[in-house]
From Swiss-Prot:
It comes from Haemophilus influenzae (strain ATCC 51907 / DSM 11121 / KW20 / Rd). Keywords: Amino-acid biosynthesis, Branched-chain amino acid biosynthesis, Transferase. The keyword Amino-acid biosynthesis applies. Its EC number is 2.2.1.6. InterPro entries: Acetalactate_synth_ssu (IPR004789), Acetolactate_synth/TF_NikR_C (IPR027271), Acetolactate_synth_ssu_C (IPR019455), ACT-like_dom_sf (IPR045865), ACT_dom (IPR002912), AHAS_ACT (IPR039557), AHAS_small-like_ACT (IPR054480). GO terms for cellular component: cytosol. It catalyses: 2 pyruvate + H(+) = (2S)-2-acetolactate + CO2. This is Acetolactate synthase small subunit. Gene3D superfamilies: 3.30.70.260, ACT-like. Chain A, domain 2. Residues 4-79 form the ACT domain. The gene is ilvH. GO terms for molecular function: acetolactate synthase activity; acetolactate synthase regulator activity.
Length: 163
């Protein structure tokens, strides 16, 4: 089972470590983790994507609520939400493949953000599935030199918010 948790926690050293520690104590792998300060500089928002046994993930979620540094935990998987990820893909771009790579970037609504005589760096944002499909399409067309993915960010749809 896949679960996306949005966690509001104190923006101080050690808070991230305690949250991640709950997952590692139970031998759970975090698929994706993003953290950044909110508009309130004393708080950070963390988005955690984890895959595993539903009961174990539920237990971890309950334990998160008990951590002193954590103000709020929302399971976005159980409600309408929007999720995005950013990828930077550096690819070999020589000869006739340059035009095809540009076409792929356009089809997926990516932007070429760096150009050299032998490579392009393309930025793309979208769902995990869109990012995966883009990377697969690039692999069929050219050589991937480097890939960097941001990790998942997510927010509930509509009027709801975590604050």
């Amino acid at each position: 089972m896949r679960r996306i948790l949005s966690v509001l926690l104190e923006n101080e050293s050690g808070a991230l470590s305690r949250v991640v520690g709950l997952f590692s104590q139970r031998a759970f792998n975090i698929e994706s983790l993003t953290v950044a300060p909110t508009d309130d500089p004393t708080l950070s928002r963390m988005t955690i994507e984890a895959v595993g046994d539903a009961q174990a993930l539920e237990q971890i979620e309950k334990q998160l609520h008990k951590l002193v540094d954590v103000f709020k935990v929302v399971n976005l998987s159980e409600q309408e939400h929007i999720e995005r990820e950013i990828v930077l893909a550096k690819v070999r771009a020589v000869g006739s493949s340059r035009d095809e790579i540009k076409r792929l970037a356009d089809i997926f609504r990516g932007q070429i953000v760096d150009v050299t005589p032998k490579s392009y760096t393309i930025q793309l944002s979208g769902t995990n599935d869109k990012v995966d499909a883009f990377i697969s399409a690039l692999k069929e067309e050219t050589t991937l030199l480097e890939i960097v993915r941001s990790g998942l960010i997510s927010v509930s749809r509509g009027e709801k918010n975590i604050l």
